[in-house]
Every structure is written in structure tokens, then in C-alpha cells.
Amino acid sequence: AAAVLATTSLVCTQAAADARKPNVIIVFVDDLGWTDLGCYGSKFYETPHIDRLAGQSAMFSGAYSSCNVCSPTRASLMTGKYPQRVGFTSYLNPNKPSGANSAATHLPASETTIGEAFQQAGYRNGYIGKWHVGSEEVGMPKQHGFDWQMATAKHGLPASYFFPYKWRKPSTADVPDLEDGKPGDYLTDALTDKGIGFIKDTVSEGKQSFFLILGHYAVHTPIQAPKNLVEKYEAKKKRMYGITPLTMIPERFNRKVPARQQNPTYAAMMEHLDANVGKVVTAFDELGVTKDTIIVFTSDNGGSCMPGSFGSRPTSNFPLRASKGWNYEGGIRIPTFITWPGTISATKISEPVITMDIYPTLLELTGCEQLPKQTVDGRSLVPLIHGEQKTLNRPFLAWWYPHSNGHGTQPCQAILQDSWKLVHYMEQNETELF
């Protein structure tokens, strides 16, 4: 009888393991432009690991961020809603907690976040890196469904990409929880290593699937990278462009954007990011969970092309127009793809999709309960991914940005409908139709 009981228990345990839901990781990159990857057309940056992963994915050529700056897009990912619906209209400024820059200062407790949805479904959830939708006082990842959090600075950028990831004086940009590093360590490496540690711990325990958001601060300012990689791209810049001067493209409000990618330090940051994506994929292979893991790769807004206080312009979004902070394509078009080996076939999808679609898509892919009253604006992309539909039949996409910002734009809204796009500047009462 004991033998029968043991066998039955073993069968039940195996059945439970077989029925376990797939793991999920969202690689959420900061300020990554649509043309910053080789698979999206970059000739200057080198991203072989990301390109290889994208080639195995459902790859979206018409993916948009929910806003042209970070905090609203991040709120949209967490809620499955337009950011303006939950009060996020611009990036948060931790030095002005009264709500300057945005109508909201944190995610409302009434929202069932994507973290809470996966927690309720039995996942072990982790969040590492850039958060920027609240602070210790008003809601960090652990208050929104994540069992484990690490390195979530109050600010939207790190004080430094080099250990100890702090400024000389205490700052809201100081990155916490990474004190066990050493001089010379690089932040993108540290975040990835800690994230892989969370994955290994969860897999070794064997009790739960994992849901992890790996929120890289890269490639946001400050533009910093190891010297040897910077030198590599300085040489590449000379080979590619010689003494040909950089062309600057005029933009509204007396702004200009670069017509080509040529920043060696930014290129070095990109290579570091790429190597770390490769490191995550290798970890999945070594753990034997590759076919049990969904990878979402995306960005929070378009690439930053304006000079600002950190020196030279990080990147160029050409042939897209303008930059992060603008509602033209360069400010809101982003690279996005979803990988699940053995389940999602390699395909390219041109239908316009947006950040808030990720939440309902992952619920459907993992077999978790759909939350239509929560994800009221997002649409599941599963029919597109599996080729069951060519379109979502969505009436339009909309962007609302009632602010000026350091990237040069003015209060602006935009609507995308079919192949038409309308951009309206509120204070100037000027409308453009493309």
C-alpha cells in the first residue's frame, strides 16, 4: 500500500509539474529607439543576441509605447490601460512628490496590476531595476504584487552605471541593494545577474512558475560604458563616416535631431545590453526551461535624440521623426517582440499594437484568468501571434501629453487611425495630418 501511495504521489507531483504554467520574463529597456537594434535596421549598433532572439519571435514592426516618456508607459504596462486613464500623463519627479509633471504620483491601489494578476495565479513574482511609478512612501513593486524586488531607485535614471551606482551626495537616483559589488562593476551586468539569481532560486525550489520584470536603466542617460567598448565604437565611427559631418534635421520649436547613429558610448551601452540578454537566454538553456518560458522584449518610449545636461545626443531614430518626448513616430514607436520556443512561430506583424496590450496578451498565453474589467484598453495579441487574425479591428490609438519637457516638445495629443495620424498642439492650436 505504501508503494502504491508513493507511486500515486509521484504521479500527482509529475502531473502538477506538467500542468505548471509557463514562466514569463519582460525585458523592459529604457529609452530604446525603434531603430536601435540590428533587427530593426541599425547599422552602427551591434546586437547579435537580441537579433537572434527576435528572429525566433513574433516581431512587431508597428509597436508603440503608451506615452512618449517613461512613467506613463510603465503605468500602462502595469494596468493594461491608457496611462491617462490612471492619472499618469508624464514622468514622475521624485524631488517634487506633490505631482509636478504628472497628475498621479503612484499607481492607484484600486488597480489590479499585472503583478497582482500573476501572483493570484500562483506565480512567484520578481521586479528588478527601473520602476518609476511610485516610491517607498506611495507604492513600490512589493505593494503591487511582486514577492521580490531589487535595485528600484526613486528616480527615473541611475546616478551612475558604475559601482557603487551613486552620486557623491545622497540622491534619489542612487540605486539601492547592490552594495555587494566591486569597483568596475557595470549596472546592466549587476541587474541581469541578480535577476538570473531570482530565476535560479525559483526554478530550484520547483514549486512555482516565475514572472520577472527585468527593468534595465539602460540605455537612459547618463551615457556611460566601459572604456574598451567605447574605443571599439570610436574606431567603427571613423571607419563608417570618416570626416563626413553629422547632418542635423530641423524640428519644431527650434529643435534639431541627428540624422544618423554615431555615439560610441551609446553603442557600447547597446552592446552591453545585448550581451546581457544573451546571458539570460543562456541561463534558461542551462536550467532547461527555454521551452517553458515566454520572453517579452520592449521599450518604454522612443530613443532620446536631444542633448540635455548629460552631453552629446544619445541616438538617432531616423528615418522616424523626432525623439523621446514627442508624439511623432520617433518618440513613440518601439521595438517589441514575444518569444516562446515551440509555441510561438517566428512571424512579423505590422498591425499597430501598444504597451497596454502586453498585460492581456500574457494572461491569455499563460492560461491565466482574463481580467476584462481591468485591462479595458489593452487587447490580447494572441490572435495576431498565431495568425488567426490580421487585425485587431481597434478603432484608433491615442496619446495624451499635456506638458512641455526637456526634449523640446509642447503640450500635444495624437491619434492613429488606420494609416492616418493626427497630431494636435494644444497651446498653438495647430493640427497636423499625416
What do these predicted ranges mean?
Residues 114, 130, 358, 381:
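Short active-site alpha-helical segment characteristic of glycosyltransferases
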Residues 1-4, 24:
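N-terminal export leaders
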Residues 20-25, 56-61, 120-126, 144-147, ...:
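Loop/turn elements at helix/coil->beta-strand transitions in domains of secreted/extracellular proteins
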Residues 84-114, 173-174:
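His/Cys-centered metal/cofactor-coordination and adjacent catalytic loops
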Residues 122-134, 366-375:
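Short, well-structured beta-strand/strand-turn elements
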